[in-house]
């Protein structure tokens, strides 16, 4: 039994002002990568909260608040199918991860440099793919 047509139909999401748009593979991949990036960012923020005290903990709380906002932003495309929301979330997280890579480089930590840089690069490729498919 071929589930692809049924899956495509189930993934049709309304976009205000744009009618219905099918969730393409490019949209799905970009949305997954963006969501993973947001979850990882929030995870690191939560670890920082739990492992720090006083002023450092306060700063970690601010970082977690911003990470949580990005998580919410990255969930909107799943609920609406909006390419615009997805691109906004993806571009924001690309910048955040690239800046995190810069911080990791400054600290001299390869994992904190290459991990975020890799996620940022994968998200960037997914965004370009989505933009090519959507045009």
Where are these regions (language model features)?
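Juxtamembrane boundary at the C-terminal end of a transmembrane helix
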Residues: 126-135
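Hydrophobic transmembrane alpha-helical segments in integral membrane proteins
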Residues: 21-39
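Core segments of alpha-helical transmembrane spans in multipass integral membrane proteins
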Residues: 34-46, 57-79, 91-99
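Hydrophobic alpha-helical segments of small multi-pass membrane proteins
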Residues: 90-101, 116-127
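Membrane-helix boundary connector in multi-pass membrane proteins
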Residues: 80-83, 87-89, 99-115, 135
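Cytoplasmic-side transmembrane-helix entry/capping segments in multi-pass membrane proteins
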Residues: 57-60, 112-120
């Amino acid at each position: 039994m071929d589930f692809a047509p049924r899956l495509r139909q189930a993934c049709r999401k309304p976009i205000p002002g744009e009618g219905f748009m099918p969730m393409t593979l490019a949209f799905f991949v970009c949305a997954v990568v963006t969501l993973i990036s947001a979850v990882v960012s929030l995870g690191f923020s939560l670890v920082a909260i739990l492992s720090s005290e006083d002023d450092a903990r306060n700063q970690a709380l601010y970082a977690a608040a911003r990470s949580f906002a990005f998580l919410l932003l990255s969930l909107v495309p799943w609920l609406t199918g909006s390419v615009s929301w997805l691109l906004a979330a993806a571009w924001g997280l690309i910048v955040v991860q690239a800046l995190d890579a810069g911080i990791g480089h400054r600290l001299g930590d390869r994992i904190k440099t290459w991990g975020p840089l890799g996620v940022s690069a994968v998200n960037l490729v997914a965004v370009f793919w989505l933009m090519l498919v959507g045009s």
